[in-house]
């Protein structure tokens, strides 16, 4: 087991005059195993972003723990957490968000490897990765604004795969891409997972994507994980009323 999320809760207080406590996550528990894809679905405001921030230790939960390889991430020092982040990384919905607009594509691809001391045989490994991801070498001298959405997402993948992560948190990674490019990226993710046994935590509102990618699926509603199980069961034979309505509404579109 790579990731073991146990009873995570988080609330925020809102309002200036009348303080109101809002529970954003309530008793969230799940596991993620080597080489598997766990999909998490939910509408806007379900708590997906807060969950991601807690998993990446950018936000402290009110209760519960996140264990990575059996170690409580909340108890790690900054240096220890840096080592964890080399093996647990994130792909953003908007790939440009991870790339500095004034850095060339080569500089952006090199950045994580330099940060985590993974520059051994870098040029050779980068060329292999460019070929694998179908990225033209001529793009290396360009800047993010000059690339298409599909090219940017491939760059985002390349820079992280060069540091050999064990877990990738994928936050709506194809939602900003057209259908043909989306299919290419999803196929690429599946191939990379088969080769490297990377574990994916795949966050998406698109149930078709989760059906294609995930072995297990969890449904997040108003901060609660109301249903989790095999993708076939959750998406085609849902038990919880919220999941039933979500599935019915999505596939009726």
Regions found by a protein language model. Give the residues of each.
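Conserved ABC transporter NBD signature motif
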Residues: 64-72
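Conserved ABC ATPase "signature" region
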Residues: 121-138, 247-248
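Conserved ABC ATPase signature
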Residues: 143-147, 151
